[in-house]
Amino acid sequence: VIRSSLAATGEEEGFHENPNLLKPREAKKKKSKNELKREGNWEKGKGATVSNRASASSSASAKATIEIQSQLTKSFSLEEIFEIVRERSAEFDSINASTALHRIASKGTKDVVENDARVRASTSSTSVSRVGRRSTTSSAATTGFERRRSENEHPYERIIRNKDFENLMQSVEDNVNDMDQFGLANVAWSLARLRVLGNEDGVKDDGEKKMLDLIARNFAECVQRQGGASVRPQAFSNFMWAYGSFKYKIHDENVLKKIYDQLEISWAENADAWKPQEMANLLVGVAHANNATDKWSFYEKVQDCAIGNLKTNPLIVNDRNADQRFSFTARDISNFLWGLSKSLKSQKFNAQSIDSELISLMLQRLVAENFGGKQSALNVSMTVWALANCKCPVPPRFMEVLNQEIPRMAKRLSASQLDAIAWSIGEAKQTLQYDNDAIDAVAEAIAENRESVYNESDPELVAKIFWALSRRGRVPADKSIIDKLVKKVELCSDDLERSDKLLILHAWGVLRISPGEKVVNKLVRTFVEDGEDSDDDHGDELEPDECAKLLCAYGRIDYKPSSNTEYGMKFEKHLQKLAKTLADSAEASRLNPGTLALGLWGCALLKLKLDEDVLDLLARDALRQTDSLKPNSFAKCVFALATLAYDPTQDDLAKLVKKAQQTIFTTNYSSSSDANINNGDDGPSFVANESTKEEVRIALIKLGADSLA
């Protein structure tokens, strides 16, 4: 879940077409690059040569440098800063250049946000990204800012598109090799804050990439030379946050290694200097730019640093004069957990990678702060996504309060926030114990999404909530919620991707929802027509698991058009193709046991008349994998083989009976759920209830078993 890439400043993410501000400019008060080249006083990648820099240094004395710096720090308006740039940029050294850019970025953007209602509207609506099956990039509904982008407008037009800013950028380029780590971090932060580089997808031109690589390389050299314990945490934080804002991956592993090695030293030896916001923004930046490392000590040390802070700096409430900078707030916690979780998962670390003590301390703090009050919607959605992403166990008290909070805030959740919570409901059913009221509240909020009757975020969001409900086996108590969600499916069916249509059909089957023939036809026609258009017999390249889910979904919702109609005949052909795909996979021994069971059961529910060869291949594979089948899947297979009138050999039948006695007709196999054949959960714990035992007993007798004692 991605909070705004400009989370450090509370601004909404967004990147813009390159205004080419980092390219060589025309001549200004001081000599241009071309003039310096002609004079032999320019080195590529380094700017002016030593002799030329020495000349400039003599003209801009140390006294002038100090004077300029004083003027910049005492300037309180954008106009004052630009006046200094206009009059004295030729005298700027590395400190002056980075300071001027930083002052313009911090002061100028604040002025624009305060004075431009359009920008304020776009920056006040922070959101989380869409998550789950397809992507982790932001796909929230189009904002006012994005609409302005399509018209080639820029929120900071008057700041960055003028001659004075170009002159300043030239000065930054000329001095970048002389900047220390803090100056470089300020330059990176300022360019990100002003949204100068690239577009919202992170696409940069070659000149921009070279500049970012140069800044990163110089920053790495500076922090290594300075030593991590002596580098201000803010420099590390601003630098990594900026690259996350750029969505720019640093490809030179040696550069990242130098930075991360010094970060580890800083967290270990200078932990008390780190503010929570600095830790959180750094992790957000690392994750957002995909700059995560596979070095475990990096994550271990940042967690240790955070734990130390949480123990040392309690939350201060009801004291406006207290210094809160070193106390974790709800916002810091949600950012920290999101960045940490996303980076850990990208490097395939397991659920135990996030320290249980850290989780406990942070979630206690979240509850104590009421999830951040007005910002609870954003904080909750980010936090539960992070917890679900790494399957983190959570304290019961946290879930108790969370289950109370979600119904209260559900009506003000944005589409992307609902998306994040819905995904966590489906993804983490073992670790996040949502109660029925919380689940129903999220489903209702999606059903009644007030952003519009139908908008571009709805198709995937509606599919996701049906998936989440099916994972929990939950049908909302208020039946109108399902009716409204089904109506949304009907409205946006043409915009649903094929995978989402399959997901919805499968969920309807699991939940035993009867949505009506009209909307089912809209979804099913996609698969029937795709299969009809294909030249092979494999259902338009549907994967075996997709075939199994479709067969099972059709059977569960009892969808089988009359074979006397043209469409009915096409549908029958479609079913046979699905079964043939499963059989081909079974023949090649590539069929997953769970997929096999689901497909066979779907065929049985549909009472499908399979070709003898197809049935034999599926049955033989079920017998071959009998020992691998989980009890619930085994029960499905036995039921299906009996329903489809398979004739097993005596040896095969004995094998089925033995497996049934060990798993179905025993109380010693496991102890957990009271599952039966209709349960879609194929988990490891299974205790057959009396209904399942009777169904399996009858099925085995149909297959020819004499005694089941």
Give the positions of each predicted feature.
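Eukaryotic RNA-binding helical-repeat scaffolds
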Residues: 3-709
